[in-house]
């Protein structure tokens, strides 16, 4: 308990007597009880106040350094992911669509879905923020039980062409250690983009 910043006397309390942040610390303490090397942290800071979120992330970073831990940090909070991650995997409808180190994903996203996500993250500098282009995705997220054929993102992608409905892209290395799943940038399907530029393809959703 003390390892996660809680007093030993808290062991005599009932669950309803703890705050959200304290319950998260207890969850971390339980995970540490088996002396793990790898921890899956699924939305560890969701539903917490911003100040408490920062405390939990700082605690996790501290424990990572002290105990040489590896985290799989699952979250919808893009700012938190950027803060704690060395590598980032972006998922859409249960499939990884981009994978690279965190700095690369945030600075040079390749997959259209990733680009849309990053464009939604506010920048503190108002002058830079004013010049940024927000990518607004149209339509609803399809059901993961019955996803669209081809690329699952094709129904919402602003860059989709007819082939995107037919071909399901693989996660391939586009740049050194930077992987993405998109036939329009994949070296495996270079002929598709060549045909599109030559006017032989057709844009459509």
For each feature predicted by the language model, list its residue ranges.
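Conserved ABC ATPase "signature" region
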Residues: 1-9, 118-119
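Interfacial catalytic loop of ABC nucleotide-binding domains
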Residues: 12-14, 132
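Conserved ABC ATPase signature
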Residues: 14-18, 22
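A short, proline-enriched helix->beta-strand linker immediately N-terminal to the Walker B motif
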Residues: 33-37
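P-loop NTP-binding/switch modules centered on Walker-like glycine-rich loops
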Residues: 40, 44, 48, 52-130
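Charged, flexible cofactor/metal-binding loops and thiol motifs
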Residues: 101-204
């Amino acid at each position: 308990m003390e390892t996660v910043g809680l007093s030993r006397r808290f062991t005599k309390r009932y669950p309803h007597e703890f705050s959200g942040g304290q319950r998260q610390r207890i969850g971390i303490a339980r995970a540490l009880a088996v002396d793990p090397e790898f921890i899956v942290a699924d939305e560890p800071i969701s539903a917490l106040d911003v100040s408490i979120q920062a405390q939990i992330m700082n605690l996790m970073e501290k424990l990572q350094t002290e105990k040489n831990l590896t985290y799989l940090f699952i979250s919808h909070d893009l700012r938190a992911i950027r803060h704690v991650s060395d590598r980032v995997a972006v998922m859409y409808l249960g499939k990884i669509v981009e994978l690279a180190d965190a700095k690369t994903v945030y600075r040079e996203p390749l997959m259209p879905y990733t680009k849309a996500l990053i464009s939604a993250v506010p920048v503190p500098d108002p002058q830079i923020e004013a010049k940024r282009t927000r990518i607004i995705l149209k339509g609803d997220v399809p059901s993961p039980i019955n996803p669209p054929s081809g690329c699952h993102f094709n129904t919402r992608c602003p860059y989709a062409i007819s082939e995107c409905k037919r071909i399901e892209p693989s996660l391939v290395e586009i740049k050194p250690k930077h992987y993405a799943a998109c036939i329009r940038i994949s070296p495996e399907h270079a002929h598709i983009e060549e045909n599109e530029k030559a006017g032989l393809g057709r844009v459509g959703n």
